[in-house]
Amino acid sequence: MALTHIESAADPRLETFRFVGDAAELERRGLVVVEGRLVVERLLADSTLQVHALLLTAAAARAMGVVLARVPASVEVFVVPQPWMQGITGFNLHRGSIAIARRPPAVSVEELLAGGARRLLVLEGVGNPDNVGGLLRTGRAFGVDGVVLGPGCGDPLYRKAIRVSCGAALVVPFAHDPDWPRALGVIRHHGIELVALSPNPSLPSIDDVAARRAPSRGVALLLGAEGPGLTDAALDAADVKARVPIDAASDSLNVTVAAAVALHVFR
């Protein structure tokens, strides 16, 4: 793999990097943007996404030498001076490393489950990219096999979501399915217990629900957006509803924290 040192910020070979802040244009071209050295390294080392090109500072290229040595020759690796980066990309959160990759084909819930997924996070209405990214990171930390995103959910491959996920969005399988609550029925049809999480104090605690479930059965934890929570349709589609027990002085948890607690209990 050869590094291409760019001598002019106007070099036409950098054209693709000039719209990395334009989500609509990225979607139109079927591309995703990965920023930050550690996340770019995860893309190169662990992800199945097809990498198109890299834009690095000289310092980042030196730091990533071992990983870059394994990059296929078909991937263009451009090196530019640090002061040029913001002018080329339009933002300054990249820490000297940006990658552009091809967006993978969409995966259905059926395809996700056909791959053997038995431990899932299922999201409804979670649109905030910080929460989407945080949930992907949490899911990877607790070994989920996949994430199902229903109506109103944000894109796990949105630039900020990838960054917040620390690259987990690049390796954890996920499926978007707007056909709701049909998708929830598909999950249950595969023998996976669907557990809906709600702050309703009248519900049994996740500890009690986890203690009663069959260890051999898969589990899908269903979470809604902060504030509105799950819709009645989603709650009605679940096998069981449960709450994360918290102090009576508090009304709820951040959705990422709730997911982490529940995944630990249902480990």
What do these predicted ranges mean?
Residues 4, 72, 78, 102-202:
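RNA substrate-binding interface of SAM-dependent RNA methyltransferases
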Residues 1-67, 153-154:
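Boundary-proximal intrinsically disordered activation/regulatory segments immediately upstream
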Residues 195-250:
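Active-site/ligand-binding-proximal alpha/beta "capping" segment
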Residues 36, 127-134, 252-258:
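Amphipathic alpha-helical repeat scaffolds
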Residues 97-99, 138-142, 153-169, 232-267:
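Structured adenosyl-cofactor binding patch, chiefly the S-adenosyl-L-methionine
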Residues 69-97:
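Glycine/small-residue-rich loop that forms an oxyanion/phosphate-binding "nest" at active or ligand-binding sites
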Residues 62-74, 234:
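Short, aromatic/basic amphipathic alpha-helical patches
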